């Protein structure tokens, strides 16, 4: 549904900087848990368009919560690993296996770069669909 993912405890847990006293105080005050791994599988917008679906079905496949989670995780790459698509699962698994279930800043930057690429591609596909209307 449309009204479930966009919650301040979720986004607070992703966006809170672990080295920022103010952020940490707010997390404690509002009982917000830290989230250090975000894995997203966006609605299949392009496949829905390609299937010849109705405009209503296409509109419903515009992912809002997922894309917001991707952007939040990528923004806080210093503290969060963002896995923006199923295509990234093998890469994450390889890193975790090699490094003992840990990531470093370079790993997180790489995932953030991939995340903004996924976000950009997704938004471009939506833009292109609207431009053809």
Residue ranges and their predicted role:
Residues 32-133:
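Internal alpha/beta core interface subdomains
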Residues 1-43:
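Glycine-rich nucleotide/cofactor/substrate-binding loop typically near the N-terminus or early
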